[in-house]
């Protein structure tokens, strides 16, 4: 039982046998919790259970939770690779009791696991308790038989946990392992406690109080247990290692990196190998959980992790993208425990490869500037924070990379001046991370939800019904009536109107009675499941308890049904064409169009789009029945049902099934497309009519969007395209079938004419004293200081042709300097200067072109002594720029 996978399984199975429900790890992106950047502890997914918002059928749970600490308050990034126990990604083993067992059984379960199941020697263990927790002190003596000397009272907050300023809190008890007196360090609470001899392996939190205000606590009616054990730490102990990076999992990754780079795992490059191994885990799991590299929020943290690993790859000599070639090794080690890695393997590889390819030039440029700016510094010096910020802000070179690169030379960064520069920039830029919450204006809906309960939805089976008015709202206030002309909202006791949800727009229609008519223009869901009908009273007065006939707009609902069903078919078709990593990131289902956003790292080719469209339309043509069923959420997932990423589902879910699952398309047994969905759908796939994909684009880094039409809109779009093609064919005097060949011939003819025109312009430009020269007021060849100078402003010449013209001029002169300026349509000037070989020792083309660039309003210029180019925004000063070159030659 020494391997990481065996240790994890043993923990879960032990608590499973002791009545705990084995719960899967929640995603690294916390669900419905804007206060957290990433999941950083096992208790995060149970937060609402501990606070009483949610109830669980089983009051005991156990999990191995994926965690990331690389942003915000919990940030281990800078230390990773240089210490034995810092990680950006780690696994937290934990058992939880929600008002069930408490301290005595928690201590008993923990002690039996580590001493009997894991077999740790009792004399190598000691524990800490909160100084005021006499109960825990006594239980450790009674259950574990520990002497007083091995139960250490800690008076500080290290042994008292609280969720926030208010809420559940309680004392902690930590279990430590003694690595032996050959390692420096003392027990917790001693002056030498920061040494590495005694290492915490498990923290037991006894939630027994409710903090109502600072310093004021009341006992909880049902105390709870929350524990956390770092898998990497306990694995190191059980494998006889004092360093987490020496455990089997990390060693397998480090060997894979060493095999690709030739680095020595025990040599000077050990830290870089460890950084890459750790960051590979964090990057891969974040991508698998839907985070993609970007310039803000979670995506920026991921980008920093990836780029830090890439910089260490360069230190190991990697000159091509490295990390993507290591994903297979991670999947081999952790894919069985975390199948999301297997599903997203292709996406992870492609995202890493693209990001490293994009970053390579930035990395090389940034390191070059860093070397240039720090080459005079010595060990103990401080690197200028303003320059560090310029590297970050202008060149995309993160601060931690600057610090990391300078660390080996013993040089630190002036963080204060970096922070000042960052603060100045933030004052001009929008905040990249904000929380979310309901505004005060929304409180009326929560009050109505509390009073009325959930609205009963009838709309899956019907578009008409009768109902009573349960509440009326106008201008954000509850009212007794709505009169003719009033705009407001109506809440009913039941409704067939679908409320906007899951990307599907809400229904419209009419609510009516004798002498009363209310036009519904929008249906929304408020306070969770309160259906709100927004619109205007067209006739009469509507009061509370008024009985109304409800009629959904049938044609509009039908179009929405078709578009929603089409998104499901397109989702499955995309998965089959592009890979299993395809996951929905958002959608819009409207009556006249649909769009579908999904994770994919690169644009989709025209051929791939055609295949997606064809596959989806095959299912439409087969006219299979669309079925829905209610299932337990775990049963639905086991059957292959696809869920919206990050969505939290109840115990029972609605599953929408389309097509037959028996065809050879890799579909599961339930059907061809199987998704958890609460929307409205067609009865048969043939009711969709036709799916026409109209566009594909990027929404954000790593997120693509396709747009499509169905049914009548698709047919109208196709007819319009055919009419346009016929009109174009008529203009070209050919048939629609022959139009591609006709267009190709015209394009070839145009290119030929453009080439001939360009050649004519170049000849005219170099004609010497001709129309072009006269028109621009340019000089002919003249002698300046004994040197021939050809200085001309040329007209109608592409900037890309200037160099070849300068070469021609050098041949014409034999000996001399050639300067040509071309002005673009937007008024910018571009200049190329050439110097013949016999004069290079006297004149540098780079120096001369920079003189001209200054006049044109540009900065610098570059090239070689015999040929250089530059530019500037003020092309109208072409003659002055040429005069500046002449003056420089004259000396």
From Swiss-Prot:
GO MF annotations, alphabetized: alanine-tRNA ligase activity; aminoacyl-tRNA deacylase activity; ATP binding; tRNA binding; zinc ion binding
Q: Does the keyword Manganese apply?
A: no
Quote the record's binding site residues for Zn(2+).
Answer: 564, 568, 677, 681
The compartments listed are: Cytoplasm
EC number(s) from the headed UniProt entry: 6.1.1.7
Stretches that traverse the bilayer: none
Keywords, sorted A to Z: Aminoacyl-tRNA synthetase, ATP-binding, Cytoplasm, Ligase, Metal-binding, Nucleotide-binding, Protein biosynthesis, RNA-binding, tRNA-binding, Zinc
Q: What domain of life?
A: Bacteria
Q: What Pfam families does the record tag this protein with?
A: DHHA1, tRNA-synt_2c, tRNA_SAD
GO CC term, one of those recorded: cytosol
**Any note on cofactor binding?**
Binds 1 zinc ion per subunit.
Cofactor or coenzyme needed: Zn(2+)
* Main subcellular location: cytoplasm
Note on domains (UniProt): Consists of three domains; the N-terminal catalytic domain, the editing domain and the C-terminal C-Ala domain. The editing domain removes incorrectly charged amino acids, while the C-Ala domain, along with tRNA(Ala), serves as a bridge to cooperatively bring together the editing and aminoacylation centers thus stimulating deacylation of misacylated tRNAs.
Specify the protein name: Alanine--tRNA ligase
The organism of origin for this protein: Rhodopseudomonas palustris (strain BisA53)
